[in-house]
Amino acid sequence: MGASEHVPPITSKAEFQEKVLNAKGFVVVDCFATWCGPCKAIAPTVEKFAQTYTDASFYQIDVDELSEVAAELGIRAMPTFLLFKDGQKVSDVVGANPGALEAGIKALLA
């Protein structure tokens, strides 16, 4: 995996609070694990979406590094994409499904 400039990592609970829960606007959170093959497979697509849908902020959470946050969010499978508007989760997409993720992002920004 590895973070990119378009999909930076969130590395603490406080940072998650600041960048996601306290954020105004649209946020997409990619919950992944370094050992997750499908997470690696969809990573370039997530990067592309982050560059395409610039009205949303994109972040990554390593569920093993931030297990407490992942548990609070109810993450049970990777990848899981959480879509937030003004700090409230409005939907999620479970699995490495580019079509479903793009549809979710478009609905979020509509």
Curated annotation (Swiss-Prot):
One of its GO terms (molecular function) is protein-disulfide reductase activity. Disulfide bonds join 36-39. SUPFAM superfamilies: Thioredoxin-like. The keyword Electron transport applies. The record marks 30 as: Deprotonates C-terminal active site Cys. Residues 2-110 form the Thioredoxin domain. Pfam families: Thioredoxin (PF00085). The active site is at 36 (nucleophile), 39 (nucleophile). The record marks 37-38 as: Contributes to redox potential value. The keyword Ligase does not apply. Keywords: Disulfide bond, Electron transport, Redox-active center, Transport. Belongs to the thioredoxin family. Participates in various redox reactions through the reversible oxidation of its active center dithiol to a disulfide and catalyzes dithiol-disulfide exchange reactions. This is Thioredoxin. It comes from Emericella nidulans (strain FGSC A4 / ATCC 38163 / CBS 112.46 / NRRL 194 / M139) (Aspergillus nidulans).
